[in-house]
């Protein structure tokens, strides 16, 4: 049996299918040409990804970019979170004094001070002589009984105020003739006391309250009736003392 030269073997991926289809026919045909190729089979499942290839060579440098123009100003952003408190800075220079504040309430009474020693003024002097004082003149008392502050001056016969306030002045005189005594404050006559002689010896007195300022002077004087004496048992006394300081 001669085999025709037109028959060619199958190829490609369809070989397996053609082989399977041709198995029944081959049992019947003992000789002859191959059959017609069958239809293409269904595509197989996708294969797995292959392994990474080798790193390629370094590329050429790119073209330099052209600087762009500045864009418009953006919108104001939201305030950020407050930061941590910083360290205290150096102390600044002192400011100008402020205005005085309102007056506060009265405080508690303080400890009692040495009021008595700071506000004392007292004296007592006597006139010890049998001679009458000069008429129409100041009367000097030449013997000091007490004068701790030295506010009475025996040389001038005047008391000088050093502690302003209310004072009391008093005198007691012995006289053997008519007597008029004037109590003077600075250049003014404050009070006059006159006593006319009825017996061989008499006593008269007078007193006055005066409010004095620092530097005021107080003294006694007589007029033509000047029968004042000062002998043992018949003294003439002039006293003054501070009652209430200002």
From Swiss-Prot:
Disulfide bonds join 180-194. Gene3D superfamilies: 2.60.120.40. The C1Q subcomplex is inhibited by sulfated molecules, such as triterpenoid sulfates, heparan sulfate, or chondroitin sulfates. Residues 1-29 form the signal peptide. The keyword Secreted applies. GO terms for cellular component: collagen trimer; complement component C1 complex; complement component C1q complex; extracellular region; extracellular space; extrinsic component of postsynaptic membrane; extrinsic component of presynaptic membrane; glutamatergic synapse. Residues 44-116 are annotated as: Disordered. It is found in: Secreted; Cell surface. Residues 32-113 form the Collagen-like domain. GO terms for biological process: complement activation, classical pathway; innate immune response; negative regulation of granulocyte differentiation; negative regulation of macrophage differentiation; synapse pruning. This is Complement C1q subcomponent subunit C. It comes from Mus musculus (Mouse). The gene is C1qc.
């Amino acid at each position: 049996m001669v085999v025709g030269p037109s028959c060619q073997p199958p190829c490609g991926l369809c070989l397996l299918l053609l082989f399977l289809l041709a198995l029944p026919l081959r049992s019947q045909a003992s000789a002859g040409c191959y059959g017609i190729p069958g239809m293409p089979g269904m595509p197989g499942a996708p294969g797995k990804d292959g392994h990474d290839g080798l790193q390629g060579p370094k590329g050429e440098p790119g073209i330099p970019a052209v600087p762009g123009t500045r864009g418009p100003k953006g919108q104001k952003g939201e305030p950020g979170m407050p930061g941590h408190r910083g360290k205290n800075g150096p102390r600044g220079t002192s400011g100008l004094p402020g205005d005085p504040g309102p007056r506060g309430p009265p405080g508690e009474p303080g400890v009692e001070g040495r009021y008595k020693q700071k506000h004392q003024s007292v004296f007592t002097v006597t006139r010890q002589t049998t001679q009458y004082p000069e008429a129409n003149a100041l009367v000097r008392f030449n013997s000091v009984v007490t004068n701790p502050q030295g506010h009475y001056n025996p040389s001038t016969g005047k008391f000088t105020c050093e502690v302003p306030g209310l004072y009391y002045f008093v005198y007691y005189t012995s006289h053997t003739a008519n007597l008029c005594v004037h109590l003077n404050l600075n250049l003014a006559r404050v009070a006059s006391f006159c006593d006319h002689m009825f017996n061989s010896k008499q006593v008269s007195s007078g007193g006055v309250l005066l409010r004095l300022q620092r530097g005021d002077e107080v003294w006694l004087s007589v007029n033509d009736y000047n029968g004042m004496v000062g002998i043992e048992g018949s003294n003439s006394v002039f006293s003054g003392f501070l009652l209430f300081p200002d």
